[in-house]
Amino acid sequence: MSIWNKPISLEILNATSKNTLIEHLNIIYTEVTENSISATMPVCHFTHQPLGMLHGGASVVLAETLGSVAANFSVGEDAYCVGLDINANHVRAMREGLVTGTAVPLHIGVSTQVWQIEIKDEQGRLVCISRLTVAVKRSRPNQAKPVAEV
């Protein structure tokens, strides 16, 4: 059974990236299943840290992007989600190639959600494991919609 409470597709997801950090890092959504979202990000000069390896912050951007977007599509039209906490363990260095992140829910509650995001290299080896906690907020009448819904 699908966890999505709003229309979701790769076309919709990739359209939300326009003029954002997501677009700047060339993060591309690649798969939506009944309970997960995946995206890729290149490991290259604009995602490197000074030693020429994948910057941990870039991995966290990918993780938070996947978890936040997934959370926002899992709530109804009367709600939206905002990040409360994120952690990441960087377990493998990368110098070039493509990483793929996949977000799956660990908990979808009324007021909070917890998402696990695994980031792997092209050989399927774990590069980073992250956990994102979000708050579920209720929209008020006439309240501006989050960017992902505009």
Swiss-Prot record:
The protein's name in its UniProt record: Putative esterase VC_A0580
Of which family is this protein a member? Belongs to the thioesterase PaaI family.
UniProt xrefs under InterPro entries? HotDog_dom_sf (IPR029069), PAAI_dom (IPR003736), Thioestr_dom (IPR006683)
Q: Does the keyword Hydrolase apply?
A: yes
Per the UniProt record, the source organism is: Vibrio cholerae serotype O1 (strain ATCC 39315 / El Tor Inaba N16961)
Q: What does the record give as EC number?
A: 3.1.2.-
Which Pfam families does this chain map to?
4HBT
Q: Name one GO molecular function term.
A: 1,4-dihydroxy-2-naphthoyl-CoA thioesterase activity
Q: Which UniProt keywords apply?
A: Hydrolase
Any one GO CC term of this protein is: cytosol
Phylogenetic lineage: Bacteria, Pseudomonadati, Pseudomonadota, Gammaproteobacteria, Vibrionales
